[in-house]
From Swiss-Prot:
Record HAMAP family: UPF0262
First and last residue of the signal peptide: none
InterPro entries attached to this UniProt entry: UCP032146
UniProt family annotation: Belongs to the UPF0262 family.
Lineage: Bacteria, Pseudomonadati, Pseudomonadota, Alphaproteobacteria, Rhodobacterales
A Pfam family assignment: UPF0262
Superkingdom of the organism of origin: Bacteria
Biological source species: Cereibacter sphaeroides (strain ATCC 17029 / ATH 2.4.9) (Rhodobacter sphaeroides)
Record protein name field: UPF0262 protein Rsph17029_2283
Length: 158
């Protein structure tokens, strides 16, 4: 079954995440483990490893690292992605999330809904960028890309 069965966030930031960021992380992990699609493509003519997979996400030397292991914890792959293509969309996502969290405290539902729609649009853009960057490295569906994008945001800013 080609899916992620365990995910770990290798977060080395000395600054603890805010309550909102921690909540986003926990929800994304829960949702990701409940339902996801993650497969490794054929490479160099060799059959790809079959899931389920254990995934560790980390940022090392300014690059996003996907460390992929079998359920038995044998390494089956690792790849690194440049953070450059994610920087602006992550920044935009965090700015709109801050606006959303503030709006929930003081604005009427109609204005909160408008901000939430903008937040979802930016989140979808981040998922699209991630799917593009994963091309040839891993195959994911859009919902999996959305949840992984949330975790990348937590890593990037947490």
């Amino acid at each position: 079954m080609n899916r992620i069965c365990h995910i770990e966030i290798d977060q080395t930031s000395p600054i603890p995440p805010t309550a909102e960021i921690e909540q986003e992380r926990q929800v994304a992990i829960f949702d990701l483990l409940e339902e996801n699609s993650f497969a490794l493509p054929v490479r160099e003519g060799r059959a790809p490893a079959e899931g389920p997979f254990r995934l560790t996400l980390a940022i090392r030397e300014g690059r996003l690292v996907f460390d992929i292991r079998s359920e038995e914890e044998e390494k089956v792959g690792e790849f690194h992605l440049s953070l450059g293509p994610f920087r602006q969309v992550v920044k935009d996502y965090f700015q709109i999330c801050e606006s959303y969290f503030e709006a929930v405290k003081r604005l009427p539902p109609s204005q909160i809904e408008a901000i939430d729609m903008a937040r979802r649009g930016i989140h979808n853009e981040g998922a699209r960028v991630l799917k593009e960057r994963l091309e040839g490295k891993a195959e994911v569906d859009i919902d999996t890309a959305r949840r992984l994008f949330t975790l990348i945001c937590v890593l990037h800013w947490g």
